[in-house]
């Protein structure tokens, strides 16, 4: 059974690094960062998700996904294709995200206003939102991650 993993958290919260370390060998990486200047980015992402699921492939959606407005359409596509849906919540740490963001290249750095806008909309997901499984992800203090169910 295919799986759709939805990463939820601020920019520079470790989501892409977590993907590379945890899912890169088994899941398709789907991120709007791959097509930053494209028109209709949401529609394109949903189309790519649909195509991957039709091929029986599991997918990680690596965006901020701060609210049901972003994750509900993803969950609906997953359900239509019989896929499980897992959410990985990266609790907000604005100061830590700002520090990591400042170390990014100019090309990938997000303006602080972008972090604040996402923080304002960011909501912790729940099972009532349609997720089959939910996990909380944090840093382990040694360059890795700690993942806890719930």
Region annotations inferred by a language model:
Residues 1-9, 13, 24, 80, ...:
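Conserved GTP-binding G-domain of TRAFAC-class P-loop NTPases and closely related GTPase folds
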Residues 3-5, 57-61, 85:
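Generic beta-sheet signal
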Residues 13-69:
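Conserved substrate/cofactor phosphate-moiety recognition/catalytic segment
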Residues 27-29, 85-87, 133-136:
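Conserved beta-strand scaffold positions in the cores of enzyme catalytic domains, especially
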Residues 47-48, 73, 117, 121:
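Alpha-helical elements of Rossmann-like donor-binding domains used by nucleotide-donor carbohydrate transfer enzymes
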Residues 50-54, 79, 127:
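Residue-level signal for alpha-helix termini/capping positions
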Residues 67-100:
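Mid-chain, well-packed structural core segment of small domains
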């Amino acid at each position: 059974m295919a799986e759709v993993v939805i990463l939820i958290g601020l920019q520079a919260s470790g989501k892409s690094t977590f993907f590379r370390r945890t899912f890169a060998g088994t899941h398709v990486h789907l991120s709007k960062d791959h097509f930053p200047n494209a028109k209709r980015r949401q529609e394109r992402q949903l189309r790519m998700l649909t195509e991957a699921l039709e091929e029986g492939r599991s997918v990680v959606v690596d965006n901020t996904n701060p609210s049901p407005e972003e994750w509900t359409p993803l969950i609906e596509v997953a359900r239509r294709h019989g896929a499980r849906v897992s959410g990985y919540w990266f609790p907000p740490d604005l100061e830590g995200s700002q520090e990591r963001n400042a170390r990014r290249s100019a090309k990938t750095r997000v303006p602080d206003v972008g972090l604040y806008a996402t923080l304002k909309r960011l909501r912790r997901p729940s099972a009532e939102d349609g997720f089959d499984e939910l996990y909380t992800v944090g840093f382990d203090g040694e360059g890795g991650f700690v993942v806890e169910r719930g």
